[in-house]
From Swiss-Prot:
The keyword Phosphoprotein does not apply. It is found in: Cell inner membrane. InterPro entries: TatA/B/E, TatB. This is Sec-independent protein translocase protein TatB. The gene is tatB. It comes from Paracidovorax citrulli (strain AAC00-1) (Acidovorax citrulli).
Length: 164
C-alpha cells in the first residue's frame, strides 16, 4: 500500500504533535486509524468483488462449453436413433414382404446364448437363529448378557447387604 518507514512515521508524529497539540492528538490519531481501517476494508471489498466477477465469467464460459457439448451429444444421439429407426422399419418391411412371421424354429434357439442363467438369491439368514445356536456355556464364558437388566437393578443386585 504506502511504503512508510520508521523514520518517516516519527517525523509525521512530531509534526502532528506540533500542529495539533498534545490534547487533541490521541483523538485525531484514533480518527485517522478508523478512517484508514475503513479504507482498507473498502479496498478489500472491491478486490473481492473483482475476483468474484472474474470467477463468474469463467463459470459462464465453462457452462457454455458444457451446454454445447451436451447439444452435440444430443444431436449425434438423435441422428443415430433416426438411422436405427429407418433400418428397423426397412428390416421389418422386408420381413413382412418375405412372409416371415418372426417366430424362430427351436433348432435356431440351440446354442450358448440360449442357456438359462440362474440369478443369485441371497440366503436371507435369520439373526435370531444364529444367536440361539450359540451354546449357553460359551455365552457364560464370553460374558454375553442373556437377560437385560437396568442400571438401578444391577446396583441393587450387587450391593452388599447390611448387617442388623
Amino acid at each position: 500500500m504506502i511504503d512508510i518507514g520508521l523514520s518517516k512515521m516519527a517525523l509525521i508524529g512530531a509534526v502532528a504533535l506540533i500542529v495539533i497539540g498534545p490534547e487533541k492528538l490521541p483523538r485525531v490519531a484514533r480518527t485517522v486509524g478508523t478512517l484508514l481501517g475503513k479504507a482498507q476494508r473498502y479496498v478489500a471489498d472491491v478486490k473481492a468483488e473483482v475476483n468474484r466477477s472474474m470467477e463468474l465469467d469463467e463459470l459462464r464460459k465453462m457452462k457454455d462449453t458444457v451446454e454445447t457439448a451436451a447439444r452435440d451429444v444430443h444431436h449425434s444421439f438423435q441422428t443415430h436413433a433416426s438411422e436405427f429407426q429407418k433400418d428397423w422399419e426397412s428390416g421389418t418391411s422386408d420381413a413382412a414382404a418375405t412372409g416371415h412371421d418372426g417366430i424362430l424354429d427351436p433348432a435356431a434357439l440351440e446354442g450358448p446364448s440360449s442357456r438359462i442363467v440362474p440369478t443369485y438369491k441371497h440366503p436371507g439368514k435369520n439373526w435370531r437363529l444364529k444367536r440361539s445356536a450359540t451354546p449357553q456355556w460359551y455365552k457364560a464364558r464370553a460374558g454375553v448378557r442373556t437377560k437385560a437388566q437396568s442400571g438401578a437393578a444391577r446396583v441393587a443386585r450387587f450391593r452388599p447387604r447390611k448387617f442388623q
